[in-house]
């Protein structure tokens, strides 16, 4: 996960690289 690697956003560990494409990355 690019965003997770950069530490820009907090996402669940369940979200894999493929999952990020399908599910929203930003949790507001």
Swiss-Prot record:
Sequence similarity: Belongs to the orthopoxvirus OPG079 family.
Induction conditions: Expressed in the early phase of the viral replicative cycle.
One Gene Ontology cellular component: host cell cytoplasm
Highest taxon in the source lineage: Viruses
Assembly information from the UniProt record: Homoomultimer (Potential). Interacts with the small subunit of ribonucleotide reductase. Interacts with host FAM111A; this interaction protomtes OPG079 degradation through autophagy.
Gene that encodes the chain: OPG079
Additional comment: This protein is synthesized in the early as well as at the intermediate time of infection.
GO biological process: chromosome condensation
Molecular-function GO terms, alphabetical: DNA binding
Protein's organism: Vaccinia virus (strain L-IVP)
UniProt key word DNA-binding: yes
Protein name per its UniProtKB record: Truncated protein OPG079
Function: Plays an essential role in viral DNA replication. Binds to ssDNA with high affinity and localizes to cytoplasmic factories where nascent viral genomes accumulate. May disrupt loops, hairpins and other secondary structures present on ssDNA to reduce and eliminate pausing of viral DNA polymerase at specific sites during elongation.
Keywords assigned: DNA condensation, DNA-binding, Early protein, Host cytoplasm
Location within or outside the cell: Host cytoplasm
